[in-house]
From Swiss-Prot:
Control of this protein's activity: Activated by calcium/calmodulin.
Keywords: ATP-binding, Calcium, Calcium transport, Calmodulin-binding, Cell membrane, Cell projection, Cilium, Flagellum, Ion transport, Magnesium, Membrane, Metal-binding, Methylation, Nucleotide-binding, Phosphoprotein, Translocase, Transmembrane, Transmembrane helix, Transport
Annotated EC: 7.2.2.10
Residues binding Mg(2+): D786, D790
Observed effect of gene inactivation: Male mice lacking Atp2b4 are infertile with severe reduction of sperm motility.
Catalytic activity: Ca(2+)(in) + ATP + H2O = Ca(2+)(out) + ADP + phosphate + H(+)
Region Disordered, residue ranges: 294-318
Protein name listed in UniProt: Plasma membrane calcium-transporting ATPase 4
Residues the record marks as active site: D466 (4-aspartylphosphate intermediate)
Species per Swiss-Prot/TrEMBL record: Mus musculus (Mouse)
Membrane topology of the entry: Multi-pass membrane protein
UniProt-listed PANTHER family: CATION TRANSPORTING ATPASE, PLASMA MEMBRANE CALCIUM-TRANSPORTING ATPASE 4
GO-annotated molecular function: ATP binding; ATP hydrolysis activity; calmodulin binding; metal ion binding; nitric-oxide synthase binding; nitric-oxide synthase inhibitor activity; P-type calcium transporter activity; PDZ domain binding
Modified residue annotations for Phosphoserine: S329, S335, S1065, S1071, S1145
Amino acid sequence: MTNPPGQSVSANTVAESHEGEFGCTLMDLRKLMELRGADAVAQISAHYGGVQEICTRLKTSPIEGLSGNPADLEKRRLVFGKNVIPPKRPKTFLELVWEALQDVTLIILEIAAIISLVLSFYRPPGGDNEICGHIASSPEEEEEGETGWIEGAAILASVIIVVLVTAFNDWSKEKQFRGLQSRIELEQKFSIIRNGQLIQLPVAEIVVGDIAQIKYGDLLPADGILIQGNDLKIDESSLTGESDHVKKTLDKDPMLLSGTHVMEGSGRMVVTAVGVNSQTGIIFTLLGASEEEDDDDKKKKGKKQGAPENRNKAKTQDGVALEIQPLNSQEGLDSEDKEKKIARIPKKEKSVLQGKLTRLAVQIGKAGLIMSVLTVVILILYFVVDNFVIQRREWLPECTPVYIQYFVKFFIIGVTVLVVAVPEGLPLAVTISLAYSVKKMMKDNNLVRHLDACETMGNATAICSDKTGTLTMNRMTVVQAYIGGTHYRQIPQPDVFPPKVLELIVNGISINCAYTSKIQPPEKEGGLPRQVGNKTECGLLGFVTDLKQDYQAVRNEVPEEKLFKVYTFNSVRKSMSTVIRKPEGGFRMFSKGASEIMLRRCDRILNKEGEIKSFRSKDRDNMVRNVIEPMASEGLRTICLAYRDFDGTEPSWDIEGEILTSLICIAVVGIEDPVRPEVPDAIAKCKRAGITVRMVTGDNVNTARAIATKCGILTPKDDFLCLEGKEFNSLIRNEKGEVEQEKLDKIWPKLRVLARSSPTDKHTLVKGIIDSTAGEQRQVVAVTGDGTNDGPALKKADVGFAMGIAGTDVAKEASDIILTDDNFTSIVKAVMWGRNVYDSISKFLQFQLTVNVVAVIVAFTGACITQDSPLKAVQMLWVNLIMDTFASLALATEPPTESLLRRRPYGRNKPLISRTMMKNILGHAVYQLLIVFLLVFAGDTLFDIDSGRKAPLNSPPSQHYTIVFNTFVLMQLFNEINARKIHGEKNVFAGVYRNIIFCTVVLGTFFCQIMIVELGGKPFSCTSLTMEQWMWCLFIGIGELLWGQVISAIPTKSLKFLKEAGHGSDKEDISRDTEGMDEIDLAEMELRRGQILWVRGLNRIQTQIRVVKLFHNNHEVAHKPKNRSSIHTFMTQPEYPADDELSQSFLDIQEGNPELVSKAGTSVLLLDGEAASHDNINNNAVDCHQVQIVASHSDSPLPSLETPV
């Protein structure tokens, strides 16, 4: 095998010198981790003498872990590698400049400017210009004619400025995102035992020899071998394609692989491979190989150029891909086949906003193209007819360059019309707004994984929220108990219980709770004890402490490795059971779980003397009516504690139906989880904002109803539904058990609480609401989740929220936004930010479209009437710069206000440009056009100055057209203030001082305009103005604000003839409309540059594993993600990268051509993104009690920065 990537020869030499200090080498461990099942067990036993011996060779203790000695840790990193994957260097500023130069419109402008520059030096022979139609009326103008090169040079200079600004934007965004990425990396931690202490360690610091504590929901950050496990089941579909969960035991299959998910149970493992030496790291190695091959091919063939998509491809090739040395491999397919395969890959589903922006941008671009072509054609026809028909001139050979110069000038005017018309600033505004919002949302405890989720939340019409930890504080406390036939409203003293009962309570809780759940001293004196681990279990452990007992002493007597069998909690069992050996022989099993479910498994109960008596169905009904329901009505979660002894013959532990029955009830406890004090107000805000909040919980229906009432989801006078999962299913399914949308449509509008629900129920509800067409508009649904089984619902939702504190890695990977404080109020803030993004885009659109309409009409009309554009090419480029970069920066960074929550959601189909906005756009366009045309055709008379109309080629700048240009720009500047309000508000200055960026941009633009007019001279076709002329320009500009008040006073309802624009379409239409997908998606293309995105999911993991198995010719095949991140962080942490599409082609071919892998003699199970996108993909998996976490729709297959594995 080749050396691991990222290590130089000298580094390898040093590493080899230290390898002798350990009992096994890096290559030994890599080979060992490639084995599975019985082969691995045999190799561990024969070659190493067991797992304990491997620990000894790695100089680690399976109980105490590593000592944490810095020198020892550094030595391990040197010998076995670090738990990171090295990134490729970032692109330099010059590379970004070169990529910005690939813009097709800029290229056309550059060519035209160069031609103009060259021809400007040409003079007809003999100096007689009159014969060519160019009359030099004075020596002064002849001198000016000699400086005709300035306009061409100025256009080139303007292009350079535009390119530099674009490159700087890309560079600064990438730098910002990289900084943000490195900050978040530090938050990703894993449970590691060092010096006998369980600590949370950043995954990048994990080394070979570490002892890792693994539990339900974890995403494994490294390869390892199981030391001790409790009912451990792993989802290895990301590596093998096998959807069944793999049971891990010491004697059958102890191999644990990075990138796989813990679906059930817990355990400990010794880390044997990290970083690029882990099984997943080896895949990254091959990925690096294919990337280098692609790069070589690209260099040989040269770049195809011209198309905008190529320009964006170049832009997205950011230097954040892996820099990994390839293993020996062969080329899979030739380039032509690659391109065909890539072309067939279905395009991703767009977000609501992206779909609307794409359509609008294409429509505006087409209109601009038509206007620019018309402008050029009319100018050329006007010139030809005037010179060769009306004036009857002949086409003389010596005049050809002069005529060409005129034609080039006309062409430049046409191109500048196109530059102004095409909404290049629109995608930039989206990117700036989203990036700004994402950064600010982090302060509001929203960690955005997928950029489009930010704006989608602004459209949310429904929120399906968990109860525990989201609406409640997730601080569990036992406040009531039913023990020995007595209902204690307060926790009694321990001496009221018989010693046997007290011992069973203490042992049952201490042993039958995960050993990772603990009660620790408060951080501050006088504070509450800290609850670490599962909060329900912490509540029970707190109950033991309240009884003045020590749970840790019991755990010390029965350490985790002595537990005989553990049935871990899952959504099917709704309970947890632990079996231990009794000292006198036989076994004892402790169980705990939901009271209604556990009581059905009990046939005996302890009385107050601690004696066992029978427990009949009548007794059960009495307990439910007199104990459980009163507790639940107070909002308490009821947990039943039970046990069972097994004497005599050892039972078959795998037959759960026989084991988890005939239990003896010890106690029922009522656990309080108080509602967060800020939640009722947050839910009231949601109601005002037109958002329906539904609670989906696994708790008892009475508990759920009580909490929902406290939160404000339900009020006493409401007639809303509060259903249990079983009843919900009976109402929505037919005789065959299939969900009927029509039945579901009758239920969900009134449903507010779904209790005792399974993950399947949650997914069914979310899917049903999203697919429903019963209402006036389609619903946009947000969902919260924290468990591994919440994955399908989180993926199906328009926006999935995972819990940052209580959430599992699987839930986080499936989500779009992570709530770092697990608080419902943070969701409301996300709604506010989402609506603010939508408004920011609308503000920019209102401003930009006004400029578009006016600039294009002025250039077109001026060209038709005066054979010249009143706004020169360089001036138009300056206007374009104001309009695109500066305005997007100013309008896209407005902070949100509470007023955003006082209106109803926009929904999927509401247009981007409302009738009010259309009124503002056209109203201001009318004002500006009247002023500009007045100044163009009467300005010379009004100001008593020389006319600038029909000026000869290369004539000097005139005050007349300078006033036109200056007034035009000042009107845009003041209209930018008007554009801050899009809903007809009167006060356009409200909150303006809170937005420092806006004030800076407006003042900065005004200062630049003064410099351009006064000092710009010939390059900008300007000449200095008098103070009086400046005052008039300023007065007309301020008139925009006054005119804005007039427009806002006109009732929009009375302007029914106005049309809305920027309509969206349903999500299905967007994703299935292949013709629309082939159009240039400007919004998407810009968003894919330097944006924040997290790489998602498992579908690409499977692809890359196929590549590995193809090259190694092994027997297992599947998919793997395209990202170049580490295994742990690509699931649980955001990315701030830019795409490299060409380097992905190799993997895309594998994905698009499973037959290729099949030919290698392997069997393929497809679990890819295409299959995952179907609506009902998860149902069967969940119903079979096996949840396949389906890969999310990839917004962009982006590579990552350096992130830990």
